[in-house]
């Protein structure tokens, strides 16, 4: 069985230590809730815009909205 001895040098930083030290303060706020509505209104605006985007895509897919100059028949797709 192949085994490998790892250096146990306490002064040597592991590869992800820099990222860990940057992200640790963000995790310190875990579970705390800011008073008030915060960014809920902004989230609602983005959800509404995304819903409008989905409706537009659905209408284009169902050919409810026809674009001028864009062929919508399968015959134009075939070579």
UniProtKB/Swiss-Prot annotation:
<dbReference type="GO" id="GO:0015979">
    <property type="term" value="P:photosynthesis"/>
</dbReference>
<dbReference type="InterPro" id="IPR036863">
    <property type="entry name" value="PSII_PsbH_sf"/>
</dbReference>
<keyword id="KW-0934">Plastid</keyword>
<keyword id="KW-0604">Photosystem II</keyword>
<keyword id="KW-0602">Photosynthesis</keyword>
<dbReference type="InterPro" id="IPR001056">
    <property type="entry name" value="PSII_PsbH"/>
</dbReference>
<dbReference type="GO" id="GO:0042301">
    <property type="term" value="F:phosphate ion binding"/>
</dbReference>
<comment type="function">
    <text>One of the components of the core complex of photosystem II (PSII), required for its stability and/or assembly. PSII is a light-driven water:plastoquinone oxidoreductase that uses light energy to abstract electrons from H(2)O, generating O(2) and a proton gradient subsequently used for ATP formation. It consists of a core antenna complex that captures photons, and an electron transfer chain that converts photonic excitation into a charge separation.</text>
</comment>
<dbReference type="Pfam" id="PF00737">
    <property type="entry name" value="PsbH"/>
</dbReference>
<keyword id="KW-0812">Transmembrane</keyword>
<comment type="subunit">
    <text>PSII is composed of 1 copy each of membrane proteins PsbA, PsbB, PsbC, PsbD, PsbE, PsbF, PsbH, PsbI, PsbJ, PsbK, PsbL, PsbM, PsbT, PsbX, PsbY, PsbZ, Psb30/Ycf12, at least 3 peripheral proteins of the oxygen-evolving complex and a large number of cofactors. It forms dimeric complexes.</text>
</comment>
<keyword id="KW-0150">Chloroplast</keyword>
<keyword id="KW-1133">Transmembrane helix</keyword>
<keyword id="KW-0472">Membrane</keyword>
<keyword id="KW-0597">Phosphoprotein</keyword>
<protein>
    <recommendedName>
        <fullName>Photosystem II reaction center protein H</fullName>
    </recommendedName>
</protein>
<dbReference type="GO" id="GO:0009535">
    <property type="term" value="C:chloroplast thylakoid membrane"/>
</dbReference>
<dbReference type="GO" id="GO:0009523">
    <property type="term" value="C:photosystem II"/>
</dbReference>
<feature type="transmembrane region" description="Helical">
    <location>
        <begin position="41"/>
        <end position="61"/>
    </location>
</feature>
<dbReference type="GO" id="GO:0050821">
    <property type="term" value="P:protein stabilization"/>
</dbReference>
<feature type="modified residue" description="Phosphothreonine">
    <location>
        <position position="5"/>
    </location>
</feature>
<keyword id="KW-0793">Thylakoid</keyword>
<comment type="similarity">
    <text>Belongs to the PsbH family.</text>
</comment>
<feature type="modified residue" description="Phosphothreonine">
    <location>
        <position position="3"/>
    </location>
</feature>
